[in-house]
Structure formats: C-alpha cells, structure tokens
Amino acid sequence: MIPPRALLLISVWMVSGGRTLLVTVQDTQRYTMLFSSIILKCDYSTSAQIQDVAVTWRFKSFCKDPIFDYYSAAYQASLSLNQDPANDCNDNQREVRIVIQKRGQNEPVLGVDYRQRKITIQNKADLVISEVMWWDHGVYFCSVEAQGDTSGDPDKEVKLVVLHWLTVLFIILGALFLFLLIGICWCQCCPHCCCCYVRCPCCPTRCCCPEEALARHNYMKQMESMTPWMLDRPYYAGADRNSQHSSYQLNPLLQRDLSLQSSLPMPAPMSFSPPNNKVLDFLETEIKNLNTAQPLMSAPHYGGASHHPSMLSSLSEVGVREVDRRVIQLPPLVEHIVSSHRSSNSSHQRRNMGSWDPLDGERDRRRNRQLDDSLSNETNWRAQERQHSDRSSGHRRDPPNNRRPRRDVSPPRRYGDSYSDESANNDPRGRSNPHSDRARPTERRRSPERGDQGRRGSPDRYSRSQRHRRSYSPPHRRDSWSSEDETRNNQRGRGRRERSYEWPEEKPPSYKSLEICAGKAPTQRPGAVRQSDRASSRSGRSMVI
C-alpha cells in the first residue's frame, strides 16, 4: 500500500513536467548589407493554448562592435576569458528597443521606433525585416510568454551584423566606376579626344577608338594644314566627291558617313612668296639665254685608228664618243719635220693649214715661206747636236762659239708639258714621227742636276721642247703649276725668240675667232692619215666642249 504522502509528490511532478516552455533559434549570428531583406528564424513549444501565447522581439545594441573592435585588446581579452564582449554588459550601458509584438492570432504591433519600417512576424515567431537600415546593427532577443508555463527557457538571442562600412565603400567604388565608365564612353565616342583603347559597353559599335573616324579626322587636319598649297579658289568640305576641288577625293574613308548636307566654305589660301633658290634662277636664266639656232656639229665617224678622240672621250671613254660635239678649231702648229717626210708633210701642211683667222692670214703665209729655209738648218743642227752629245758623253755644256743658234719658227707657248707623251710622236695631221721616238725622254720631270744640260741642247731637251711647242695644256708635274713656272717658261721662250727669226709681234696668234664647223669635216687622205691606238683627245689640234 502506497502512503498518501508519496502520491502527492508524484502528482506534483507530473503536473510541472508536462507544462514546460521551450524557445529555439536556427542561427545565432547573421550578416547582412544595408537596404537588404533578412529573416530571423525563431520557434517555441508550449502546452498552453495558442491564443494565450505572446511573442516579443527586442533590440539591444552591441556592447562592443564585433567588426571595428574585434582586433582591440579588450575584445581579445574577453574572448580569452570565454566571454562575449559584444553582449556581456548591462542594459543601462546600451540601447534597448522593442521591435514588434504579437499575441495569439492578432496582428503584430510595431514598436515606437519602428512605426515606419517594413517589419513583420510570420509563422510562429519568425522576424522579417524587409529593408535593413544602419541602426539595425545589434542583438535581437526572441521572447515567448505562455500562461501556465513558468519553467523552461523563454527567450533566445540572435546577433545581426550589418556591414554598413562595406556598403559605403562599395557605394564609393561604384560611384568612381560610374564616373570612369562615363568618361570612357565619352572619350570613345568622340574620336577627336580619344585616348584609350577599352571597349565601351554603352556604344560598342561606334566606340573603342574607331580607326576609320580617326583616319578621317587626321586627314582633315592634314588638309587644313595644306590649305596654302591648294588652289587659289576656296574648296568646300561638303562638295561632291567627283568634283575637282573636293577635299575627300584622295581618301576613300572620307567618302562614307558624310553628315554635312550643305557646303561649308573653307578659308581662302594664303599667298606665300616662292623660295629664294639662286641656283635654280641661274639655271633658268642660262637656259633662256641659250642660242638654240646655233648649229651643232656631230663628230665625224672614223674607222679604226684614224679616229681623233676628243677631250671628253679622253676623260671618260664610256658613252661620250656618240654625243654631239662642238668643235673649236685651234691655230695650226708648226713642227720640226724631218727630211725624210719633208715633201709629203710640207705639201699636206700647205693644203690643210688654212687661215683660221682672217687677221692672222698674212702671218701664216709668212711662216710658210720661212719653213723651207728652216728645214735645212734644222737638219744640220741635229747632226751637230748629235756629235756634241757623243763628244760630251753626259750632255755636258758646249762652248758658246761651237753652238749653232737654233731657229724656232713656232710661236712661243705659255704652257710647258702636254697631257700625254703620245703627242710628241704624232703630228697634228695624224702621222707618226719616227725620229721623235728616239728623242723621247724616259721620265717626265727634269731632275735639278740636269737642268743646265737640258737648256744647252741635249736630245732630251730637244724632245721636251718639241712637246712644249705642241701642247697648250698646263705642265704635268707632281707639284702645282704656279706663276713661277709661267715666268720661267716666258724667259725660256724669250731666249729662243732672240735666236730665231723675228716675229711680227711678241704674242702668239689670237684665239678670239672661233670657227664653228657645221656639217663639214676636214678632208684627209686615207693613206696619209694614220694614228696610233694609244692616241687620245689631248692633241693641240682641236678642243671639244
């Protein structure tokens, strides 16, 4: 039999155990952004009737901010002591607000501070915040009250962390990106100030530095800079592309996308003075003064060795002989002709030595009359010179009384040496002088120790004097030709004139008259005219320009 006291204790335990209240939450901590929506889950279990249950959501601010104060020394010390520094503080140290309340099946009622907010309770006790604000950052407590349930855990907490600082940062970055995007789109759509190569989403077909628009713009800039060099009449930017004065006819890119409906007159070109080029002016003046009516004589074609090369052909043998040449005939040269060729040379000379100048005709006839007398004296003088040279065996100086004065019938020449040694072997009529080969010197320049011997009548001196009288070219020496050489040559020629026949005048024949041979070539006998293969245009017969 159970005592009555035991039965009382059992009945009290059963009654108290069956009416216990239990509140649960799904997440104890949530993170959200500003202006976002969030749902805080909360549920409860009770034996009371649903109309007797009241649900209340309260807000309490953080004691210490879990974001900004997380790395502080006090926050880390509380964590080391297994405390919650964000929530372990009295209510008088933080802000406490009632968010919303609901009893039974009635409509929820917002708190005083949340009257204008979009906040509600759904299901049993879920809190729904449609738009999270800056001050929603804190701890939310879900409390349930049921009549008759006095035991159990009537409330639970949920931490809501609002990332307001990150939102502000994102807003700032978004604004900068917006300005950057606007700037990119603006500069991409305006080719005159394009400075970037990034594709713009606002106008992908027209932007990203269009090369065609840039080419048109650059071409227009070049055309504006070239305005002074265009025609005197103003051109128009919107003219017809087939027009002669159109500025777009040179670039095909300018033929497209022309939005100008009317012609825009461009400024008139500026006048510039022509550049001062004295060389071009001089050449134009010379060309204008050129006498085109003056006939030009082409050089006659000779075959083989009988061709007389000109000065130009001697300087450049390639491609000059076929050029039309203007021949300036120089005065004939009187040479010492040996007795073996006396008759043929004298007759040929009388036929070919025509008066090249009317003023010098009398002088030429007088010179021809003296030629026969000088030939005999010249032969005797050659024999005596050869005997004296054999006797002296070194071209020593002969006594003055043993020397026979030499007659020089040729006019004095100003220049000493010729261009080449071939002129000493060939007379101006194309025949080779066999006796001049024996008298040819082995070197061009006279050595200082043999200077007196050359003046006294040695064979070398005679051959050099022959070349001196045949050439009008300057001396071919290693040193430069100066006035001292000219003075020495004049003295030498003056000494020869004292021992020769008296000339009618001191100067050689005048060169002021030029005979232009147009269409006539000098007649020569094929048998008598012959020239060596080494003959060049350096002879004294003609000068070709």
From Swiss-Prot:
Residues 373-382 have a biased composition (Polar residues). Belongs to the immunoglobulin superfamily. LISCH7 family. Residues 21-159 form the Ig-like V-type domain. The chain crosses the membrane at residues 165-185. Residues 21-164 are extracellular. Homooligomer. Interacts with MARVELD2 and OCLN; the interaction is required to recruit MARVELD2 to tricellular contacts. Its main location: membrane. InterPro entries: Ig-like_dom (IPR007110), Ig-like_dom_sf (IPR036179), Ig-like_domain-LISCH7 (IPR051874), Ig-like_fold (IPR013783), LISCH7 (IPR008664). It comes from Xenopus laevis (African clawed frog). This is Immunoglobulin-like domain-containing receptor 1. Keywords: Cell junction, Cell membrane, Disulfide bond, Immunoglobulin domain, Membrane, Receptor, Signal, Tight junction, Transmembrane, Transmembrane helix. Residues 360-372, 383-416, 428-463, 476-489, 498-509 have a biased composition (Basic and acidic residues). It is a single-pass type I membrane protein. SUPFAM superfamilies: Immunoglobulin (SSF48726). Disulfide bonds join C42-C142. GO terms for cellular component: bicellular tight junction; plasma membrane; tight junction; tricellular tight junction. It is found in: Cell membrane; Cell junction, Tight junction. Residues 186-545 are cytoplasmic. Residues 338-545 are annotated as: Disordered. Residues 1-20 form the signal peptide. Pfam families: LSR. GO terms for molecular function: high-density lipoprotein particle receptor activity. GO terms for biological process: epithelial structure maintenance; protein localization to tricellular tight junction; regulation of RNA splicing; tricellular tight junction assembly. Maintains epithelial barrier function by recruiting MARVELD2/tricellulin to tricellular tight junctions (tTJs).
